[in-house]
C-alpha cells in the first residue's frame, strides 16, 4: 500500500490545492469518495487492470461515476488514466482526506478497547486527546476482546497502550532481562 500512497500524494495534493482555490473542498471530498468506491469494486478493479487504452478506461470510470464527477473530476480521472494510475484512486481519496483534516485542524485518533465504550468514556478520551494534540479530534472506536481490559489509543504520531495485554507483554519482556 505504501507504493500506492506514494503515487497518490501528488494527485491528492493537486486536487486539494485546486479544491481550496475553488472553495469546493466538500464537493471534491464527495467526488473522490465516490470515485474511490467505484475503483474499489472487484469488477472495476479487474477492468482497470486490463490492457485497454487509457482513453477507454477513463471513459468507463467517468461513465460509471456519472454526474458525481464535474469536469475537473473527470480531468483528474483522465490524467490518472493516461499515467496508468487509476488503481490509485482510493489512495488519492485517503490522502485527500488527510489534507482536509490537516486544513481543518482535525486529528484522527483510533481507540481500541476491550469492551464497547460508553458516551462518557468517549467524551473523556476525546477531551484528553484534544488537550494533548491541541486540535479537534475525530475518534474511531473499535473493540478487540484480546486486549483483556483497557484501551489502546493511536494517532499518526504516537501510540498509548493502556491495555492489560500490553502491560503483560511489557512485564514479560522485563522479566526476560
UniProtKB/Swiss-Prot annotation:
<dbReference type="GO" id="GO:0015986">
    <property type="term" value="P:proton motive force-driven ATP synthesis"/>
</dbReference>
<dbReference type="GO" id="GO:0005886">
    <property type="term" value="C:plasma membrane"/>
</dbReference>
<dbReference type="GO" id="GO:0045259">
    <property type="term" value="C:proton-transporting ATP synthase complex"/>
</dbReference>
<dbReference type="InterPro" id="IPR026015">
    <property type="entry name" value="ATP_synth_OSCP/delta_N_sf"/>
</dbReference>
<keyword id="KW-0139">CF(1)</keyword>
<comment type="subunit">
    <text>F-type ATPases have 2 components, F(1) - the catalytic core - and F(0) - the membrane proton channel. F(1) has five subunits: alpha(3), beta(3), gamma(1), delta(1), epsilon(1). F(0) has three main subunits: a(1), b(2) and c(10-14). The alpha and beta chains form an alternating ring which encloses part of the gamma chain. F(1) is attached to F(0) by a central stalk formed by the gamma and epsilon chains, while a peripheral stalk is formed by the delta and b chains.</text>
</comment>
<dbReference type="GO" id="GO:0046933">
    <property type="term" value="F:proton-transporting ATP synthase activity, rotational mechanism"/>
</dbReference>
<keyword id="KW-0813">Transport</keyword>
<keyword id="KW-0472">Membrane</keyword>
<keyword id="KW-1003">Cell membrane</keyword>
<dbReference type="InterPro" id="IPR000711">
    <property type="entry name" value="ATPase_OSCP/dsu"/>
</dbReference>
<comment type="function">
    <text>This protein is part of the stalk that links CF(0) to CF(1). It either transmits conformational changes from CF(0) to CF(1) or is implicated in proton conduction.</text>
</comment>
<comment type="function">
    <text>F(1)F(0) ATP synthase produces ATP from ADP in the presence of a proton or sodium gradient. F-type ATPases consist of two structural domains, F(1) containing the extramembraneous catalytic core and F(0) containing the membrane proton channel, linked together by a central stalk and a peripheral stalk. During catalysis, ATP synthesis in the catalytic domain of F(1) is coupled via a rotary mechanism of the central stalk subunits to proton translocation.</text>
</comment>
<dbReference type="Pfam" id="PF00213">
    <property type="entry name" value="OSCP"/>
</dbReference>
<dbReference type="InterPro" id="IPR020781">
    <property type="entry name" value="ATPase_OSCP/d_CS"/>
</dbReference>
<keyword id="KW-0406">Ion transport</keyword>
<keyword id="KW-0997">Cell inner membrane</keyword>
<comment type="similarity">
    <text>Belongs to the ATPase delta chain family.</text>
</comment>
<keyword id="KW-0375">Hydrogen ion transport</keyword>
<keyword id="KW-0066">ATP synthesis</keyword>
<protein>
    <recommendedName>
        <fullName>ATP synthase subunit delta</fullName>
    </recommendedName>
</protein>
